[in-house]
Amino acid sequence: MTQPITSEPGLAEMAMNGIRDLIRAQGLRPGDPLPSETALAAHLGVSRPVTREALRGLATLRILDIGGSRKARVALPDASALSLVLDHATYSRGMSIQQVLDVRRTLEMRTVGLAAMRRSDAEATELLDITARMFAALEGGHTDLMELDIRFHSLIAKASGNHLYAMLVDSFWIITRQTWAIGWRSRATHQNRRDNIKCHERIATAIMAQDASRAEAAMSEHFDSAVSVLLRAGVT
């Protein structure tokens, strides 16, 4: 029989843990509904307000989906909650753009090699298509280029075949949107900006050819260039 949660401090947090345990014990998958709020409260031995607070907390973490009057459902995990945590950690600890790039480099040197070995034909084709669209957007504002750049790196992580890598790379999206323009402005000439896109094209071409070594070399060149232009612009 389930033991009721009676400790006053941290009731909602304990209820959140109890709901997570229930999800695993019942083998619930993304999209599956949870028991009603009343049933959950009885199962956990807490009040309905505590249960409601726990459900909201799990929804914020993207563990649950709560929409309107529907029952809470198990959510398909995404990087949104982790992205907020990373953004706060970067701000609160005063981390530099260079430090963020160092972490991204470590992750993406691995994802690009795996993507070259595991990518689908559709993923490889889309990567090349993104680079073509980046060239086309070069004459316009940087907003389109930023979104294409973010999509490019996200797709490589997805093509690695490892969902954790995909979530980790995607979790940088808030930071990337805040800092992307700084890096772009640091590429002061049209040719330098075009060279940056050419590097993306080399990455995509290597992934299409399933050449992991060449893909890793191109990704290393990409991050070397990013670090270099920021240093020249005085960004540390």
Where are these predicted regions, by residue range?
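Short helix-capping and inter-helix turn/linker motifs at the boundaries of alpha-helical repeat units
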Residues: 10, 102, 143, 193-194
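Conserved amphipathic alpha-helical segments that form helical-bundle/coiled-coil interaction surfaces
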Residues: 104-182, 199-205, 214-226
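Hydrophobic/basic alpha-helical segments enriched in Actinobacteria
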Residues: 15-16, 24-27, 33, 121-128, ...
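Short linear motifs at protein or domain termini
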Residues: 1-107, 113, 117, 235-236
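C-terminal effector-binding regulatory domain of bacterial HTH transcription factors
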Residues: 1-2, 212-236
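Short alpha-helical linear motifs
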Residues: 79, 149-153, 190-197
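A short secondary-structure junction motif
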Residues: 22, 26, 81, 175-183, ...
